[in-house]
């Protein structure tokens, strides 16, 4: 979500210097940052295993897996926009490369802004209300993107979807860490594993389905998936 500005910078570097120089610069910067922060990493204190494992064992708690499914249902639509929105605008709406890239940047930008505001929003309203209203807004955004007839319509729709998707995963992760019948470490591990399966396994099937049925059908399906979160 913090990649909206680097998208433009990266595009400029690729255009000016080519992919190899771009990758070299990114690798050098990443290495420099890693080496600079390494001495300041806080060392883990040794904790006895008996203290680490508290509460019920994972297989005894159905709630934690239910939360994991919610995270999965939220991450798959996010993945569909991140990986395929630009392709959708290029192939279906005849957008230019710049406009297609902007659609993803707008999605990432609105998602970043409202994710930073997530704590304030959840403190003002309860988490369940935020979860349901956010999934509804995200579903409306993706459905509007599927029905768009112009690149700018889809760009605005993806921006709206970003607002809705922003706090779905954080709320799920927060719930995972606050379950009374399972330790925080175990709960977070289970939910993040289930949730990130969406980003790992979803891109290829989404692309395959899009080739068969078209991207509008894909984003309509993603909207329905978000609707499932609202009803849970």
Please describe what each predicted stretch is:
Residues 2-5:
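Short, small-residue-biased leader/transition segments that mark boundaries at the very start
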Residues 167-180:
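Intracellular juxtamembrane helix-capping segments at the cytosolic ends
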Residues 14-28, 207-226:
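A membrane-interface helix-boundary motif in multi-pass transporters
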Residues 14, 114-126, 210-211:
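Helix-to-loop junctions at the C-terminal end of transmembrane segments
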């Amino acid at each position: 979500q913090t990649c909206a500005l680097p998208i433009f910078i990266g595009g400029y570097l690729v255009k000016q210097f080519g992919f190899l120089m771009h990758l070299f610069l990114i690798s050098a910067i990443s290495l420099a940052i890693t080496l600079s922060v390494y001495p300041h990493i806080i060392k883990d204190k040794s904790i006895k295993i008996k203290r680490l494992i508290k509460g019920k064992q994972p297989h005894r708690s159905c709630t934690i897996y239910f939360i994991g499914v919610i995270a999965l249902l939220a991450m798959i639509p996010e993945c569909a926009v991140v990986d395929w929105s630009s392709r959708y605008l290029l192939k279906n709406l005849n957008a230019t490369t710049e406009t297609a890239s902007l659609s993803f940047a707008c999605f990432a930008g609105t998602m970043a802004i409202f994710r930073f505001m997530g704590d304030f929003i959840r403190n003002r309203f309860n988490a369940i209300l935020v979860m349901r209203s956010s999934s509804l807004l995200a579903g409306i955004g993706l459905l509007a993107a599927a029905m768009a007839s112009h690149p700018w319509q889809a760009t605005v729709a993806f921006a709206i979807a970003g607002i809705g998707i922003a706090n779905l995963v954080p709320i799920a992760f927060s719930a995972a860490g606050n379950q009374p019948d399972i330790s925080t470490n175990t709960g977070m591990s289970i939910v993040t594993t289930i949730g990130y399966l969406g980003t790992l396994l979803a891109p290829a099937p989404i692309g395959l389905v899009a080739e068969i049925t078209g991207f509008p059908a894909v984003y309509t399906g993603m909207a329905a998936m978000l609707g499932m979160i609202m009803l849970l």
